Amino acid sequence: MSKRHRLDLGEDYPSGKKRAGTDGKDRERDRDREDRSKDRDRERDRGDREREREKEKEKELRASTNAMLISAGLPPLKASHSAHSTHSAHSTHSTHSAHSTHTGHTGHTSLPQCINPFTNLPHTPRYYDILKKRLQLPVWEYKDRFTDILVRHQSFVLVGETGSGKTTQIPQWCVEYMRSLPGPKRGVACTQPRRVAAMSVAQRVADEMDVMLGQEVGYSIRFEDCSSAKTILKYMTDGMLLREAMNDPLLERYGVIILDEAHERTLATDILMGVLKEVVRQRSDLKVIVMSATLDAGKFQIYFDNCPLLTIPGRTHPVEIFYTPEPERDYLEAAIRTVIQIHMCEEEEGDLLLFLTGQEEIDEACKRIKREVDDLGPEVGDIKIIPLYSTLPPQQQQRIFEPPPPKKQNGAIGRKVVVSTNIAETSLTIDGVVFVIDPGFAKQKVYNPRIRVESLLVTAISKASAQQRAGRAGRTRPGKCFRLYTEKAYKTEMQDNTYPEILRSNLGSVVLQLKKLGIDDLVHFDFMDPPAPETLMRALELLNYLAALNDDGDLTELGSMMAEFPLDPQLAKMVIASCDYNCSNEVLSITAMLSVPQCFVRPTEAKKAADEAKMRFAHIDGDHLTLLNVYHAFKQNHESVQWCYDNFINYRSLMSADNVRQQLSRIMDRFNLPRRSTDFTSRDYYINIRKALVTGYFMQVAHLERTGHYLTVKDNQVVQLHPSTVLDHKPEWVLYNEFVLTTKNYIRTCTDIKPEWLVKIAPQYYDMSNFPQCEAKRQLDRIIAKLQSKEYSQY
């Protein structure tokens, strides 16, 4: 053996030759050798024991993971192969990775990973962490029963209490079912009544499926589509699915459609149920699942031809309910007081959930709670206050899942306080909530067809809503619900269930969509709760005056185009008609501004400064043109956040408006509607915009009476200009965007108009033969007479 290739046998290897005179040394060396050998044996034994323990650990971990995977309906992991295994060459093509990888810095062996069927990559460790939590949801016990019903029935009703996991898990099981079928793979749609729920649930499910949001899992809400050609599971608002049905009446893209939160009975959900009931008859391969959080599901079963019912209980704990002895005069004040008291006095850990009615109220409450807790000094526990309402951007909505602040050294408890609209009633589940404060109010749409007024009013909630709110406190452990109303009010004054939205809404948009879907016989359309005939008649009348329907009630070319815009019919008409007045660019901007939340910020501590800032944008002719000024200034200042802050403008609203404007522009381009502007230096620049406003809102006009108040034209309702208007004078004729019912009747977002435009632009509506007697009629009669004479022909 050459020196270079000789094995290094070590100095312990006995040599064949014995050196003379070294007996004593040899004995000593032998003893050393023995000691070292024993040490090595001990080391080897310890190493063997360590390896055995590692193997045992790995075996246990694999066994528990396999049990978890098998219960989830996934294949178990295989044992890892050695590098020389005959299978290793094919490991990349197998459904499991064949090698266990060694992490050098710890020496631990990680488990072989399952391949994600959607990405063809190994699942991330986070996937398994989330999977463990998923498998603890009550809904998992019912997976086999669910799959069995899904296979055997075309439609069925599923009742699952909030927190059972139905919204996140059922759609994923439907994806599994669709992937198991032969032929082209259709998608799964899951509708939500609220934008916030559609966005946050889609994000959660994308995490659970270990995919990127917007790829295999996406969402679609008005003015925002986060999906792609790869999307197989789409969460969307019910209105968006209805819009998809207009261009795809049989909804061929989907194999399963889930109507979630159906108990909320929104306008779009009710219409969708009627549409899907018909689609199911024409498509035997379509599955429809109606999901509800309340137990009054019998009505849904009967509606869908006595289909089966699957009930999944939630995991709820007892909730202690407290009422106020006397009615509260100011529920907002009482709510803030209750939050502070619970935070200071309750010795149990646990987060708070406060229900309020809208964004302004929520922002105000958040500010005041923070201020009051800060004033209490450092001895009190830290508090994290999180608002929740539909117009919050997705990343801020995700804050509700953050942990509460830690305990202080003095033992003071840190708490999370979520201040939410009724979206937290059933749509979203927030773990960790132990205390619920329920003032007993929510904003509801109310419609009076006689005077054609639809308003959002703060009204008392139903008993069903109150029960849902209380249930939020018992999700993780026994909780407490503080109702800021009396027990007598709960028992005697509250309705059992919330009135379906279809019975209290203006149906203009709905009728236009149904006509676009080819449903002409509205009287015999299968509504779950048919609306009042008068409400339907008012909707048909509105669409006829807007020229969306002809006198026979058929959809016109204009009406068909209007239906493609995700806007109220009046706004859609105004956008299309603005092309004829050379101001479609400006009307697009105004429409976008009207489609987003209020852009003017008016903080309690800086009302005067905010009002002064607003007046810098004010246009003499009114609020619509003021909104246009704000949008133009925002763009000229390069969409600056600081500029918005300095001018008391809501940056988020302006960015949303910009997004809405781009989407509406794309729809205009699709129909070859020209986007143009009148020369800014022309005296007609603002006149043309105001005329375009009249094309959509000629039915929403008020006339100033000699007594100093306004009367709405035709309906003769006494109204006043809303205090927020920039009009510093009282024009004789005003067009208004909305009628606000509060302590007084207000008209909001108003513009000064000329009566001549009314009779020229909407002669059918301003036909004097069926006009009620009033000062406005006498004025219009005179104008019509003048217009008919040649002297006024320039109009």
UniProtKB/Swiss-Prot annotation:
PROSITE patterns: DEAH_ATP_HELICASE, HELICASE_ATP_BIND_1, HELICASE_CTER
Binding site residues for ATP: G160, E161, T162, G163, S164, G165, K166, T167
Location relative to the cell: Nucleus; Nucleus, Nucleolus
Disulfide pairings: none
GO cellular component, one term: nuclear speck
Residue ranges of the region described as Disordered: 1-111
Catalytic reaction equation(s): ATP + H2O = ADP + phosphate + H(+)
Xref: SUPFAM superfamilies: P-loop containing nucleoside triphosphate hydrolases (SSF52540)
UniProt feature, compositional bias: Low complexity: 79-110
Basic and acidic residues bias (residue ranges): 20-62
KO phenotype (gene knockout): Conditional deletion in intestinal epithelial cells leads to impaired antiviral innate immunity, leading to lethality following infection by an RNA virus. Conditional deletion in intestinal epithelial cells leads to impaired antibacterial immunity, characterized by susceptibility to infection by enteric bacteria C.rodentium. Conditional deletion in Paneth cells leads to reduced expression of alpha-defensins and severe DSS (dextran sodium sulfate)-induced colitis.
Domain Helicase ATP-binding: 147-313
List of residues that carry N6-acetyllysine: K488
Organs and tissues of expression: Ubiquitous.
Entry keywords, A to Z: Acetylation, ATP-binding, Helicase, Hydrolase, Immunity, Innate immunity, Isopeptide bond, mRNA processing, mRNA splicing, Nucleotide-binding, Nucleus, Phosphoprotein, RNA-binding, Ubl conjugation
Record GO biological process: antiviral innate immune response; defense response to bacterium; defense response to virus; mRNA processing; positive regulation of canonical NF-kappaB signal transduction; response to alkaloid; response to toxic substance; RNA splicing
Positions of post-translational Phosphoserine modification: S15
Motif (DEAH box): 260-263
Name used for this protein in its record: ATP-dependent RNA helicase DHX15
Annotated organism of origin: Mus musculus
